[in-house]
């Protein structure tokens, strides 16, 4: 799948931090902004390809929404709404594609055509 999308203009593949180990359950890439990520997701859905977590799951997979953690809220002056603007921008401009063990042979080409 990486080869199918690596040369698409406007897509930057995510680089995993040094020393980390990926779980190999998703391919994550970045696009210029939130609007592009949402357009990408819509195009993928037209190809019957769902995304995994990004861009849609920032409401529960992002520390900005973790108001149930009083220590985190207190550490950021009582509100998390504007505590992580760079993280929000990066997450909103990310798309995550699921990786399956028995992926259909045409899956990468369908991703690329979206």
Name each model-derived stretch.
Residues 1-10, 38:
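Conserved core segment of the aminotransferase class I/II
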Residues 2, 13-30:
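Conserved glycine-rich beta-strand-loop-beta hairpin in the small C-terminal domain of fold type I
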Residues 7-14, 78-83:
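Short amphipathic beta-strand starts and helix->beta connectors
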Residues 18-20, 34, 57-60, 101-103:
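Short, solvent-exposed loop/turn segments at secondary-structure junctions
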Residues 41-95:
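Conserved PLP cofactor-binding pocket of PLP-dependent enzymes
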Residues 97-99:
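Short, proline-centered helix/strand-breaking motifs
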């Amino acid at each position: 799948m990486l080869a199918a999308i690596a040369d698409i203009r406007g897509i930057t593949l995510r680089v995993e931090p040094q020393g980390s180990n990926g779980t190999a359950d998703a391919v994550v890439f970045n696009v210029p902004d939130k609007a592009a990520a949402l357009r990408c997701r819509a195009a993928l859905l037209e190809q019957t390809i769902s995304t995994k977590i990004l861009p849609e799951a920032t409401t529960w997979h992002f520390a900005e929404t973790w108001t149930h953690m009083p220590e985190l809220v207190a550490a950021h002056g009582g509100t998390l709404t504007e505590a992580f603007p760079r993280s929000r921008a990066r997450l909103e401009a990310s798309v995550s594609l699921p990786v399956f063990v028995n992926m259909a042979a045409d899956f990468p080409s369908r991703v690329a055509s979206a």
